[in-house]
Amino acid sequence: MINNNPFPINDRWDLMTMKVCKFGGTSVASAQQIKKVAGILKAEPSRKIVVVSAPGKRFENDVKVTDMLIRLSQASLRGEEIENNLSEVIDRYAQIASSLDLGQEIIDIIEMDLRDRLASDKSNPGLFFDQLKASGEDNSAKIVAVYLTSIGLHAEYINPKDAGLLVNDFPQRVQALPESYNRLTALKEKA
């Protein structure tokens, strides 16, 4: 039997007792959708590791957070005024957080993260663009983790880098480095 799975399957990595699940942008686009995600996780405790996308479209003509972040990064790279674009992103997260009764603290954390990313080095525009765009998933994960905790589920936000995910530095063609897979198995130990 050929196993093309990049994760070693052995006594420490029993895929039958733990599930890793990914929820796309539509699944985390609104508070109502995040509540559905929570229901799925609550109903099946074997879902131990959750990966989420940036909030997607809530309705047909809506704008995805990723598209907002692309506009924000482009404006920043061109040296244009960015406050309106930044407010648009923060407001989307604030709407979700408010509807989940999460309070202002999580929004302050997200705003600080976005401002830190916007103030980062722009000498490599592609890398700047990628790291700002990646904030969509990262900040979505923060909201989901806080919400899950608020309803009594054990949840912990883990930054992908802290989890062991290492990537190349090819702008807009980022891929996980092979050594990431062994590092990510340590995440299973925590789950």
Model-derived features: positions:
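Short hydrophobic transmembrane-like helices used for membrane targeting/insertion
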Residues: 1-2, 9
